[in-house]
Amino acid sequence: MSGWHHRHILDLASFSRDDFASILELAQRFRSLPVTGVRKLPALQGRLVATLFFEPSTRTRSSFELAAKRLSADVMSFSPSSSSLSKGESVLDTARTYVAMGADVLVVRHRSTSVPQQLAADLDQLGERTVVLNGGDGLHSHPSQGLLDLLTLARYFDAQKPTPQALDGKKIVIVGDILHSRVARSNLWALTGCGADVVLCGPTSLLPEEFAAFVDAPPPGLSCDPVAQRGKVTVERRLEQALPGADAVMTLRLQKERMTQQLLTSLERYHRDYGLSHARLQLCGRQVPVLHPGPVNRGVEMTSQLLDDPTICLVEEQVRNGVPVRMALLYLMAAAESAAESSLVSISS
């Protein structure tokens, strides 16, 4: 892990294939710990991780907090409803309060785009050593979700050695509300960065044409790794055209809370055109895995029968992979490598 060079983790745009390989390797090692009987490592003992979630979360927050505890870190949780935000305190001042209490890592989620980036820049300008890990910001990015989806797919294609090479040349279909999805954006960086070809599928109202050029012409403020041989991104409007030849399918939640106007005729119409079912997946030509970042709207993004089928649906596997991936991120960001590596037990991946 000596080549790790990211101080903050704010998005995946600048991640190289070597970065993805480092995270997959470390996450796989952490994932194997229960098999050895080891439930906890002292790698981050004495470190303080603060989870500042200004937006509701079940999986991400719980997963980060469990990951920190598995590495023996102390954890502080922030709740907007019981904070000084209601008294007019700014997000930056709230974050600085936790920094003053000794937080080594701030895991930040906010409904507004670029809040974690601004916090990181402000803390750097102040000369603080605290690092910022983006737990999801607006429509921009959700790095840890993109990475756990990457691990889930890499393990599906090669359980013994989940590496970026396991994704090389694979066709991954992402279907649904891509316009409002930070998960889709992070998956685009992760999957194409590992050589997978991504097909985006959805109605025009939820999938603008410019997404086809997303990784070739990144939005302002994002620096894309220029070296990696990225997979390509294409847009399909009809699911029947997108599915043939797919190696995996990811469907996304309709984020009605982010829709400022009527973008869909009806949920029934959406399910008819873009909902996944066992029958519709037969268009892939073979059995393929289905992913969903959760929470799932049953009967909208996919049928209940498909969601409850563990032979195809990997939703619970995604949840299981969230903890080791976030352990890997916290380890890389907060631990002095020389000290932390000495605490790792030898685990064969």
Curated annotation (Swiss-Prot):
Keywords from the UniProt entry: Pyrimidine biosynthesis, Transferase
Enzyme Commission number, as recorded: 2.1.3.2
Short name of any one Pfam family annotated for the protein: OTCace_N
Leading EC class: transferase
InterPro entries: Asp/Orn_carbamoyltranf_P-bd (IPR006132), Asp/Orn_carbamoylTrfase (IPR006130), Asp/Orn_carbamoylTrfase_sf (IPR036901), Asp_carbamoyltransf (IPR002082), Asp_carbamoyltransf_Asp/Orn-bd (IPR006131)
Keyword Transferase: yes
Any one GO MF annotation of this record: aspartate carbamoyltransferase activity
Residues holding carbamoyl phosphate: R59, T60, R109, H142, Q145, G294, P295
Described purpose of this protein according to its UniProt entry: Catalyzes the condensation of carbamoyl phosphate and aspartate to form carbamoyl aspartate and inorganic phosphate, the committed step in the de novo pyrimidine nucleotide biosynthesis pathway.
Protein name in the entry: Aspartate carbamoyltransferase catalytic subunit
Species of origin: Synechococcus sp. (strain CC9902)
